[in-house]
Amino acid sequence: MINRKAIGYITANYSSTYGSVLLKDRPIASVPFLGRYRLIDFPLSNMMNAGIKTVGVVMPGNYRSLIDHVGSGKDWGLDRKKGGLFMVPGNAYGTTKGGMRFLLRDIISNKTLFQRSDKPYVVMMGTNIIFNMDLNTIIDAHENSGAQMTVVYCKATRNVDDETKLEINENGRLTGVSAGVVYGDNASMDCCIVNRETLLEIIDHYQAADYLDLLEALQATLATSTCAVTSTRARSWACLARSRCIAAAWTCSTRP
């Protein structure tokens, strides 16, 4: 199955605000999980299961562990002549700046990836949250909403400073964005669907403010009501519950 509606964009150039010896020389995207997996396997697998065949991965300065694990993308069907896996440049400071998942500077630097696509949508994902989700359902919901962007969220189960709070009205429209969540808040899952043309407009508009994150730019856009943004709540089963269920949904690299 080939998804003819969307391309993928994964940000792998940031670390965690929580200190760990595992993060000393690597981004969070290449942190091991249950032995054989790395955290980047999960967004790649979600995109593979949705039939997305063009994926750009934003690389950090300390990219060796990612290259060693992902390779050519063969394990996700991304070693292709048309489309495939693209390792695109990222900004080194993005590896440690808390709360930043979709830096505009990275998006602007990789404008060509979006310009060359003939797909109408871009699926953007981070690598710090593990979940299994049918992205085709989210893409269809976005298409039916008529919004320029759809943000996936869940209810926060704890207080976290390094996550993004979403304010959502009774119609499911996003009305505000802020840093930090407490229990029960609407927490972004660092997954969104955006119209490709809208993303290109954002790139052109924010050339001089490329230090912002996409959601920070979104906050300014909401204030001027120039962009319609809807939201989709992730069902509770979308998050990891049992390790024995992983093999059916997720693919890991066969490389060492």
Language-model regions: role of each:
Residues 54-60, 151-153:
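Short internal beta-strands
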Residues 39-44:
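Short, well-formed alpha-helical segments that are part of the catalytic scaffolds
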Residues 64-87:
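Acidic donor-binding segment of Leloir-type glycosyltransferases
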